[in-house]
Curated annotation (Swiss-Prot):
A motif (Nudix box) lies at residues 43-64. One of its GO terms (molecular function) is bis(5'-nucleosyl)-tetraphosphatase (asymmetrical) activity. Belongs to the Nudix hydrolase family. Keywords: Acetylation, GTP-binding, Hydrolase, Nucleotide-binding. CDD domains: NUDIX_Ap4A_Nudt2. Divalent metal ions. Residues 2-139 form the Nudix hydrolase domain. It comes from the Eukaryota. This is Bis(5'-nucleosyl)-tetraphosphatase [asymmetrical]. The gene is Nudt2. Its cofactor is a divalent metal cation. The lineage of its organism: Eukaryota, Metazoa, Chordata, Craniata, Vertebrata. InterPro entries: Nudix_hydrolase, NUDIX_hydrolase-like_dom_sf, NUDIX_hydrolase_CS, NUDIX_hydrolase_dom, Nudix_hydrolase_domain, Tetra_PHTase. The modification N-acetylalanine is found at A2.
Length: 147
């Protein structure tokens, strides 16, 4: 059975002008261990939790951002399937916008750095093709949805 994890692709954007979606920035976290890869906040599902509850809890634990500081967008949910540490893994992601552009990020010990990045930079740091594709799909979704 595949390991299951859930997370949020967190973004922020300047809303002036509203038609300009080139100002979208994604939040990526750099892991403290392993290959120090960059991903959105995510983590394993705890017993009794649903997937979205897991994503919100992990986001709070890893970034300090509370659910009340986010708007989870309807209509975007992506499932990534890959092998991690020789085991199959499934990760579910939703898109979530921070309500405050200057929200404070407080990293847990699991991560050593964070960056707000435009799509191209985010895709360069996201080493895995599935993650790059998901970021691109998220950006495309945002550009086709009014702010």
């Amino acid at each position: 059975m595949a390991l299951r994890a859930c997370g949020l692709i967190i973004f922020r954007r300047h809303l002036i002008p509203k038609v300009d979606n080139t100002t979208i920035e994604f939040l990526l976290l750099q892991a403290s261990d392993g290959i120090h890869h960059w991903t959105p906040p995510k983590g394993h599902v705890d017993p009794g939790e649903n997937d979205l509850e897991t994503a919100l809890r992990e986001t709070q634990e890893e970034t300090g951002i509370e659910a009340s500081q986010l708007i989870v967008l309807e209509g975007f949910r992506r499932e990534l399937n890959y092998v991690a540490r020789k085991k199959p893994k499934t990760v579910i992601y939703w898109l979530a916008e921070v309500k405050d552009y200057d929200v404070e990020i407080r990293l847990s010990q699991e991560h050593q750095a964070y960056r707000w990045l435009g799509l191209d930079e985010a895709c360069q740091l996201a080493q895995f093709e599935e993650m790059k594709a998901t970021l691109q799909e998220g950006h495309q979704f945002l550009c086709s949805t009014p702010a």
